[in-house]
């Protein structure tokens, strides 16, 4: 289940294991390329792995998704301006 894969990856992110988190979220993004939450999570992980250009690519992509709500749009725009550490 792609949602479980996302959740496992996010759990690794929350305990600062970004390498393992990236492995799971990479799979989740491939399985659910149009899910804004998964792409946002993946962007956050990429940022923590110092892959900032790729992180911004995923965050910008979230802004184009039809299921992105207003609160997420606001949060993504803050990340795009200030990065993750200041959002």
Predicted regions and their residues:
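Canonical tetratricopeptide repeat
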Residues: 7, 41, 75-79
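Conserved structural position within tetratricopeptide repeats
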Residues: 29-30, 64
């Amino acid at each position: 289940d792609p949602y479980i894969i996302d959740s496992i990856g996010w759990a690794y992110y929350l305990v600062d294991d970004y390498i393992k988190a990236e492995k799971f979220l990479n799979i989740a993004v491939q399985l659910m390329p149009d899910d804004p939450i998964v792409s946002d999570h993946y962007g956050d992980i990429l940022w923590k792995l110092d892959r900032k250009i790729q992180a911004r690519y995923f965050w910008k992509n979230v802004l184009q998704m039809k299921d992105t709500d207003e609160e997420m749009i606001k949060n993504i725009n803050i990340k795009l301006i200030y990065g993750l550490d200041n959002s």
